[in-house]
């Protein structure tokens, strides 16, 4: 039941955002009482926290699985930046968490750091194999990747540029790799 509650919450969060979905809507959708929800979650905030925890765990798992498969450097970079799984968090929801759920947003920041560290590892691997120019300044490129992560989660930037997060990531990966691949 806990998983079903979380699945419905994820759908509602995607539709309405973090602050506008209600426990009544979850109960109505699942045809259960709010009391049943409270048997599994202490509060709406606990559901939000579980939603983010699930999404971020799945995100890291997706990255690890894609890196485990033999892939090109470009595929590894793309898989790290844009991981695909069932609980993708919309950019608008990440922004909402940043404003209204700062403790939850800290987990998003930890996941972002995991991805930045993973990218640094991929870049080092590329330098060692000769796929990436050895003259590339690693800390500068890592900082650039960190800023890119901020940009693709900036809702205003995406609206202004008329890009989805996925399209923005594809563009950034293309720009970076065409500039550093031998």
Which residues are covered by each model-predicted region?
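Amphipathic, non-transmembrane alpha-helical scaffold segments
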Residues: 48, 52, 56, 105-116, ...
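Secondary-structure edge/capping motif, primarily at the C-terminal ends of alpha-helices
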Residues: 66, 91-99, 152, 156-159
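Hydrophobic alpha-helical connector segments
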Residues: 50, 54, 61-89, 142-145
């Amino acid at each position: 039941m806990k998983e079903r509650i979380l699945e419905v919450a994820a759908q509602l969060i995607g539709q309405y955002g973090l602050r506008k979905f209600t426990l009544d809507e979850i109960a109505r959708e699942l045809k259960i009482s709010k009391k049943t929800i409270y048997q599994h979650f202490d509060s709406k905030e606990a559901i939000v926290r579980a939603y983010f925890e699930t999404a971020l765990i799945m995100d890291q798992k997706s990255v690890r699985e894609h890196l485990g498969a033999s892939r090109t450097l470009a595929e590894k970079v793309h898989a790290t930046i844009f991981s695909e799984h069932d609980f993708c968090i919309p950019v608008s929801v990440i922004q909402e968490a940043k404003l209204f759920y700062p403790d939850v947003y800290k987990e998003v920041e930890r996941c972002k750091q995991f991805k930045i560290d993973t990218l640094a590892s991929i870049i080092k691997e590329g330098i060692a194999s000769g796929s990436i120019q050895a003259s590339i300044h690693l800390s500068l490129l890592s900082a650039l990747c960190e800023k890119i992560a901020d940009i693709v989660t900036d809702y205003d930037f995406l609206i202004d540029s008329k890009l989805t997060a996925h399209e923005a990531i594809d563009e950034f990966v293309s720009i970076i790799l065409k500039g550093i691949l031998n």
